[in-house]
Amino acid sequence: MFRKKYSPWIVVAVILVILAAFLWSRTAQTATVDIPAAMGESEVEFGEFAEEYANFPAGYALQVENGTDLTTDGVVFLEKANDDLYVQFTNRSQTDSEFVLKLFLDYSEVDFFIEGVSYSEYEFQLDDGVGVQIPIHLDSQIDLQTSHMLTVGVFAAPNKYASDLDLMSNSYGMVATFEIVSPSGTRTCDTQLQFEEPAKFLKSQFGGVMLNEDFSEEDTDQVLYPLKEVTLSPGEKKSFAYRLGNYSGEVLLIVLVDWKQIPLNGADYLAIENKPGYMGFGQVEITAPMEKGKYEVVAFAVDAPFTPRTADNFFSHDTAYRFTLSVE
């Protein structure tokens, strides 16, 4: 797995065969409304893929704008935290798909408004070659005289399950963190978060994040995929092993079940102090929902989470191979 660094638009290439298995849909609708050239529109707008990105590799493009200024290296200037923002996302995966938008403020899941309606997650359908501009604002009164981090996740095929597919993938959308701060503010994050070393450091060249049931503590470059389906009883607790490979320092692990952030060891995320050349290894506990059914499990890792965004650290986050939690 290779790290992806693209700016000001972040673009991620995908493995098309795997992606097609996740994203294929019989009910795709064609969006034909052009995205306006100027920002400031109040409605969700769909349009044909922008000509300037026609030569980009197949995949996705993600950006956040404030309506007046070009976002450079992931820094978005706002006067107030609830000012309008515009999430721009383009599908060039060569497959039509549904997507779900999730937002996290300082790495905790938050609700947001679109056209005056509150959402914890926003689903939309996008044909290949089509982009969408989604006007959002946060329901937040945080002080932007210092920087805060807005993580934007757009995940593909939210209504499909890994358990029903022949292939597994860790390329199912994009997640990136943008720094929001007042133009007159100080670009520094005021955080008292304590990062801890993982349970063990393993010698490994593996790069990225993995969540599975392999609890072996051997030094190895080979990391096992998770099972496509894990079966639990309602409310049952189960431990999973995490692996965070070749991050150079502070890293957060965030896990979603059914597209909702879940607590990890009593917090919204796991804060790990990793070291280069090693794979951080430990365990987290997941509690099965009380209602029977299928729930998709996804995870992502945020490198240098509270470091101001620059060209050196503004890139899409690594995502783990998704799997299905079946509650019976």
Where in this protein do the model-derived segments appear?
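N-terminal Sec-pathway targeting helices
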Residues: M1-L16
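A eukaryote-biased signal for short, well-structured alpha-helical docking elements
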Residues: I18-Q63, G173-N212
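Beta-sheet-dominated interaction scaffolds and their linkers
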Residues: P57-N82, S216-P234
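Short edge beta-strand/loop segments characteristic of extracellular beta-sandwich folds
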Residues: D84-R92, S239-G245
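Short acidic, flexible loop segments centered on an aromatic residue
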Residues: S93-V110, L244-Q261
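Intrinsically disordered, low-complexity Pro/Gly/Ser/Thr-rich segments with frequent PxxP/GP/PP motifs
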Residues: E115-D143, A267-V284
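Short glycine/proline/serine/threonine-rich loop/turn segments at secondary-structure transition edges
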Residues: Q141-T151, M290-V298
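Short beta-strand elements
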Residues: Y161-G207, P305-E328
